[in-house]
Amino acid sequence: MTKKYILALDQGTTSSRAILFNEAGEIIGIEQKEFQQIFPKPGWVEHDANEIWASVLSVIAGVLLKTNVEAKEIAAIGITNQRETAVVWEKESGRPIYNALVWQSRQTAGICERLRAEGFSEMVTEKTGLLIDPYFSGTKVRWILDHVDGAQERAERGELLFGTIDTWLIWKLSGGKAHVTDYSNASRTLLYNIYEQCWDDELLKMLNVPRAMLPDVRPSSEVYAETVSYHFFGEEIPIAGAAGDQQAALFGQACFEKGMAKNTYGTGCFMLMNTGNQGVKSKHGLLTTIAWGLDGKVEYALEGSIFVAGSAIQWLRDGLRMMKSAKESEGYATKVTSADGVYVVPAFVGLGTPYWDSDVRGAVFGLTRGTSKEHFIRATLESLAYQTKDVLQAMEADSGISLKTLRVDGGAVANNFLMQFQSDLLGVSVERPTVQETTALGAAYLAGLAVGFWTSKEEITNNWNLEQKFSAEMEETDRAKLYEGWQKAVRAAQAFK
């Protein structure tokens, strides 16, 4: 029987998904399962790593059943994951010693404050391209070792293992044979030197994390291990690709050339620009990260994070009850010709790139007696585009590259009004692909390349199909005036603390 499919496991923040792709990069089937979010205290977010594993097994079985595909028809498995989320488990039993600490969780804020006070900020950014922030894995590992009795000593003796979610899943699928991560996930831990490509002694010492816990760092496209047959319907299938979700989306969007960029419009927005084999050190509040390791080379990216995007539309729907479904936002927005001077700054949890202001809160400016629900909804949608322009300006300033085209994916890209406004505001074309599951597709491509299912990046580029292109129609003067209003609104929101 021929190997016809690649299985992508997309392990996200609220659900796990299994997606089958064929050789053309088309979706054959999807299965999804949500799992529990654990909030022990305000600002803390945890997951049960065993429940994540159970959800992954469930969606693998579900997608094979739904599509009538047999396990032996799968050429390889690729994994993409919510990044930074940290798991610590016992090497012998495979039992996690504590819940996984999720990327969103702020429970390590105290550790971060101490590190900043001790003057580590510059060294950390210099080596990792990141900031000292609870977002990244390193302080999460420290927290678990501090809060579980005897964990530090056990870790030093080599009895405990640490991994991001990709590492946990590869370890489980391989029956404990492979304790590995890829370059892209390692680059999000705060423990990895992205320029020398190694776990860094100075960073490990800063957080007192024992080297014995750490996974091997491997290329993003390589056979790491095979599934143990009892976890995979009697088959030993190569586990052959891994990348963090945003890097996988960059790969799935075929952004292989230096200067190509994608923006994912999900709960938040994540914009990544490929900077080639040079890590660009940001002076404008961006993160420098590894995009992937492939063919013996590491490629880098600049990343901008917008905390609130699609969740602002959910707020209109659930919090303000302005509409019944997020889809309706487009209809409301197009009933008016402009937002009539209204600006929504959706800083519900602070502002990300380029401001990194965690104290600012949401604000609305420019309301008059004539402001309608339609204006309000339109202004909220426009805020996603304004925040994206903030990030793009920082990227262009850091990289010296002028973007010509932005490739987009994520739930909110179905909104044609938003995509057109985004193009108008940036003054560049916005391209929406036919296959919008680009994160899973990226993981599938990485795995497929490792086993010869696809042979080159050129083949993948040829698979990329345009569904719709949005071209800028706005006059430069109008664009500048609108954006100036946004900048004024952000400054005013920041002043109100």
Swiss-Prot record:
GO terms for biological process: glycerol catabolic process; glycerol metabolic process; glycerol-3-phosphate metabolic process. CDD domains: FGGY_EcGK_like (cd07786). This is Glycerol kinase. The phosphoenolpyruvate-dependent sugar phosphotransferase system (PTS), including enzyme I, and histidine-containing protein (HPr) are required for the phosphorylation, which leads to the activation of the enzyme. PANTHER family: GLYCEROL KINASE, SUGAR KINASE. Keywords: ATP-binding, Glycerol metabolism, Kinase, Nucleotide-binding, Phosphoprotein, Transferase. The modification Phosphohistidine is found at residue 231. Sn-glycerol 3-phosphate binds at residues 13, 83-84, 135, 245. One of its GO terms (molecular function) is glycerol kinase activity. Gene3D superfamilies: 3.30.420.40. PROSITE patterns: FGGY_KINASES_1, FGGY_KINASES_2. Glycerol binds at residues 83-84, 135, 245-246. It comes from the Bacteria. ATP binds at residues 13-15, 267, 310, 314, 411. GO terms for cellular component: cytosol. It is an enzyme of class 2 (transferase). Its EC number is 2.7.1.30. Pathway: Polyol metabolism; glycerol degradation via glycerol kinase pathway; sn-glycerol 3-phosphate from glycerol: step 1/1. Belongs to the FGGY kinase family. Key enzyme in the regulation of glycerol uptake and metabolism. Catalyzes the phosphorylation of glycerol to yield sn-glycerol 3-phosphate. Activated by phosphorylation and inhibited by fructose 1,6-bisphosphate (FBP). ADP binds at residues 13, 17, 267, 310, 411, 415. Homotetramer and homodimer (in equilibrium). It catalyses: glycerol + ATP = sn-glycerol 3-phosphate + ADP + H(+). The keyword Ligase does not apply. InterPro entries: ATPase_NBD (IPR043129), Carb_kinase_FGGY (IPR000577), Carb_kinase_FGGY_CS (IPR018483), FGGY_C (IPR018485), FGGY_N (IPR018484), Glycerol_kin (IPR005999).
